[in-house]
Each structure stands twice: as structure tokens, then as C-alpha cells.
Amino acid sequence: MIALTLAALALSASPQAAQDRAAPSQSAGSAAPAAETGATQAARQWLALVDAGNWQESWAATAQSFRSMNTVQAWQSASESARVPLGRMLSRIGRGEESIPAPPHGYQLVRFRTDFANRAGASETLSLAREGGSWRVTGYFIE
């Protein structure tokens, strides 16, 4: 299966990442269950912007490392090429979160199984880093 890579993966986070590990969570639709970590909740909130086709706001909500490597126009073009053909998001189930110990402090990977109108069972993976006290997306991948 060909991966639709929408952004480069930046490797920056804080030691907080290790504290926010969680067992895989499951959720129908896009509602976040109470047991989800801050990183998973931030990923869902960011994906809601992407689901709505709000490219400017979703770009602005990413980490500085993402924004420095991607212009709004490049993000919009890549998103429209990869996401729009999938159609409306129908359901998104959390498949887990993983701390990756990479320099300087690691990052969190959050995975979802997502059904879109034109493609069931897609795998979405987001990398997130702590920035300014919040989790911010540094990379987004669809397979």
C-alpha cells in the first residue's frame, strides 16, 4: 500500500511526553473518550480542522517545525490532493499512542483507524511534540 505522506516528521518534544503515555483507546466518530491523553485529544482536535478542509487553521495549529518546512500553500495543495479524494470522515477509532525517544526529548505518535466515505480502514498516524505547553502536530501520514 502506498503511503500518502503529507508532512515531514520533526523530532522535538519535551520530557512531558513520557508522562502522557496511554493504552490504546477506541472511539466511534470523532468524540474523545475521557481516558485519552492530551496528545490524543490534541490530535483529534487538529484532525477536526483537517476534516473540515480548514487548511489555513490546521496549518497554523501545527508545531513551528512543521510550519518552517511547509508553507500554507504547500500544505493546502498536499491536503487537497490526498485528503479530499477520500471523502467525508465517517468514523475514527483510536489505535494507540507511543512515545518515541528521539533527540532532543522525543515525540508522541498517535494512530487512528479511520473510515472515509471513499475509503474504509485507512490508517492515520500523527506525530506530536510539546510546544508552548501544548501538544502540536509535527507530521501527518495516511496509509
Feature locations, PLM:
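Serine/threonine-rich, low-complexity intrinsically disordered segments
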Residues: 4-7, 116
